[in-house]
Amino acid sequence: MAQISKYKRVVLKLSGEALAGEKGFGINPVIIKSVAEQVAEVAKMDCEIAVIVGGGNIWRGKTGSDLGMDRGTADYMGMLATVMNALALQDSLEQLDCDTRVLTSIEMKQVAEPYIRRRAIRHLEKKRVVIFAAGIGNPYFSTDTTAALRAAEVEADVILMGKNNVDGVYSADPKVNKDAVKYEHLTHIQMLQEGLQVMDSTASSFCMDNNIPLTVFSIMEEGNIKRAVMGEKIGTLITK
């Protein structure tokens, strides 16, 4: 019998760095396998799951821009990096017999389906794992903003933000400030006013305007994705 989750449909946001593990660069097969196993476990429950992956383990558009590259070109390179991560995750999921589709905002029909909202929803209804890649298809927008937009479009109940270096939202960097306090609950407006670096302000404002809750948690602890889907109190919950 399938376990009952708190949410019917979720968007899982993974940073590219989370897929690199301690190496900090590239794709760590052990991490990908662990994430895939956790996602596959959730997919077997009564919960529909979409995944959005960043590309910072391969390329960061802002870094290229800071070094003098054209910002648009640098951002498009970052979008391609997210596709590489998405294909790696898809392969790992399919090795676990988990039906998966990659949908990209930039057409590349040889490797993935183009993003169409109704098609994405249909895949989710058929209990397929959907991986969104290539951001929103436009430069100057982060994958955090992609997560917020796609969550609204597919009417997800929550965005689960899996982090690799922190287990929630703190008042300051806990690695630098030993007096940093971990928040169990925040509002979107608090997050914006206090400048807490959970996601960029565009994404945060979008979540606030569209009443999309977030759960920020550590992806590095085995089983945390399932715990988040079950509604267990892990990490930090951010609501309107």
Swiss-Prot record:
This is Uridylate kinase. One of its GO terms (biological process) is UDP biosynthetic process. Belongs to the UMP kinase family. ATP binds at K13, L14, S15, G16, G56, R60, N164, Y170, D173. Its main location: cytoplasm. It comes from Staphylococcus aureus (strain NCTC 8325 / PS 47). It catalyses: UMP + ATP = UDP + ADP. UMP binds at G55, D75, I136, G137, N138, P139, Y140, F141, S142, T143. InterPro entries: AceGlu_kinase-like_sf, Asp/Glu/Uridylate_kinase, Uridylate_kinase, Uridylate_kinase_bac. GO terms for cellular component: cytoplasm.
